[in-house]
Structures are given as C-alpha cells and as structure tokens.
C-alpha cells in the first residue's frame, strides 16, 4: 500500500502565507496550535504539538505565496535563525521538514537551515539549485498549478500574482 508521511498545517509568521487567523474570530486563534509563530521560542513551540498529534513532516512557509494577499511572491518570511530552530526541533524528533518557498532568498535560507525539501521553487536560480544538490535537499516542483488554478475566479491581486509566477515555475 501507499506510504504516508502526514503533516499538520503549515507553520508561518503572523500575517504571512500560513496565517488564516484573521478570517473568522474564534477559529484558529493565534498560538502554538494555530501554526502562527514569531521568534525562535514560538517556532519551537509550534513544532511540538504537530509532532504530538502525529506529524511525520513539518511544513513551514519560508516565503510569501501566490494565492495569499501578503507580500510579493517569494519574499522571505522567516529569518535564518527561526528556520534553523524549526528544523533543529523537528530533526531532534526524527521528523522531516518541508518548506513552502517560491523566491530564491527564502529558498536559500531554508536550504541553509537544513530543510529536507522545498515545495514550489518557482523563482529558483542556478546557484540555489547547486546548493540544494550539495545539501541533498529535495525539490518538489508544483508545475501542475498552472492547470489547476482557475485564474478567472481569483481576486484581481491574486490573479496578477499567479499570472506572473506560474509561467516562471515551468522554466
């Protein structure tokens, strides 16, 4: 049968790609269990409940995203110190780390922090590919998103972001 490596929700910064706490009061209030974490101590505290509840992979948002309203696509969100703390805590428990990352700066920071895989890699350069190979970091391209996203039904800002990044993800 299939081998499953379940992850919980993504861990990200306040106001970042993973932050859905502002949509409905009382749902996913900010705290370690929400996955919203700022600073080294909060990042470590956010990893632990996920492991407690059976996550075999910790997913973090190292950069801003395409289908969220915060920041330009690919802008680095976590600091190098925060990423390193998240990776160290997960690895201490034998759990892998996957990083959502579109932009080169955030991808490099995540790779240098020791993440096991980078999801998307839409705006990747040759030097960072070399670094990923040297570090043994898996690249998980999501080039299918160009076919899966209905651009006509996106809000204008998200449509512009998607129209800009999706063709670059295939290069």
Residue ranges and their predicted role:
Residues 115-117, 135, 139, 164-168:
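A post-motif C-terminal structural segment
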Residues 46, 86, 106, 128, ...:
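Residues within well-ordered alpha-helices
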Residues 7, 100, 120-121, 142:
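Generic beta-sheet signal
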Residues 79-85, 90, 98-111:
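N-terminal active-site wall of soluble small-molecule enzyme domains
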Residues 5, 59, 98, 117-119:
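Structured core elements
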Residues 1-93, 128-130, 135-155, 159:
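Divalent-metal coordination cores built from histidine and acidic residues
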Residues 92, 96, 156-171:
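His/Asp/Glu-enriched, well-ordered alpha-helical/loop segment
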Residues 108-128:
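Structural recognition of alpha->loop->beta junctions
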């Amino acid at each position: 049968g299939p081998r499953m490596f379940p992850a919980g929700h993504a861990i990200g910064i306040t106001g970042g790609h993973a932050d859905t706490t502002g949509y409905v009061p009382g749902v996913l209030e900010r705290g370690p269990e929400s996955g919203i974490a700022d600073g080294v101590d909060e990042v470590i505290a956010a990893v632990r409940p996920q492991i407690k509840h059976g996550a075999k992979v910790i997913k973090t948002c190292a950069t801003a995203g395409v289908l969220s309203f915060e920041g330009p696509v690919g802008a680095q969100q976590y600091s190098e110190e925060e990423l390193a703390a998240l990776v160290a805590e997960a690895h201490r428990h034998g759990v892998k780390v996957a990083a959502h990352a579109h932009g080169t700066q955030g991808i490099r920071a995540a790779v240098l922090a020791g993440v096991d895989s980078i999801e998307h890699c839409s705006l990747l350069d040759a030097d960072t590919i070399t670094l990923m190979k040297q570090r043994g970091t898996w690249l998980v391209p999501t080039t299918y998103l160009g076919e899966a996203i209905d651009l006509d039904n996106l809000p204008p800002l998200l449509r512009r972001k998607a129209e800009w990044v999706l063709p670059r993800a295939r290069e």
